[in-house]
Amino acid sequence: EGDAFYMGSLAEPMSCIVGTFHAMYHTRKDSYVHDMGIVEGGKMAILAGVGPMGLGAIDYAIHNERRPSLLVVTDIDNARLKRAAELFTPEEAARHGVELHYVNTKELADPVERLKAYTNGDGFDDVMVFAPVAPLFEQADRILGQDGCLNFFAGPTNPELSANINIYDVHYASHHLVG
């Protein structure tokens, strides 16, 4: 009851988003030290990222002190993508040093190829998945770059949900997962 309840209801989801950004980690070649957080000035993708939590992640990615230089946000709903682009414009992101793109992956013959093209084929440093959909998680795995960190943010309700990942890349490309 009252303002405190309302403010608390807004703070909890954002604290989850902030925690997610800080849970991401990266490693250095020949070192076992984990550098916590997203890659500053790196390449980030937010998949299925225009729902309420995804919008919070876009906001945080653009306005946080540690932000990517490239942010690609995907979804399969044009109306939601349009709304996200109105709330967080590429121009606003550019003022903060972030090149922002919104992409409808449903309209693409090969979403992985198209998304990796934003990185000149190198893949993304940080990828967040905001929907508990196995093919989406697998897509995220395929767009990771060297030392890429994949965060499965979406809490699945199905305890049997599983997806394939490239184990070779876990070992040789230093891919890692957090959730």
Language model regions located:
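Glycine-rich phosphate-binding loop and adjacent beta-alpha segment
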Residues: 85-96, 131-179
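Residue-level preference for short coil/turn positions at secondary-structure junctions
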Residues: 4, 40-41, 67, 123, ...
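Structural motif
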Residues: 36, 63, 118-119, 142, ...
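Glycine- and charged-residue-rich phosphate/anionic-cofactor binding loop of Rossmann-like
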Residues: 6, 125, 175-179
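Residues forming the Rossmann-fold NAD(P)(H) cofactor-binding site
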Residues: 55
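Short regulatory "switch" loops immediately downstream of catalytic or recognition motifs
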Residues: 21-31, 84-90, 154
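Adenosine-nucleotide cofactor-binding segment
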Residues: 41-42, 47-50, 58, 62-137
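NAD(P)H dinucleotide-binding glycine-rich loop of Rossmann-like/cofactor-binding domains
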Residues: 1-43
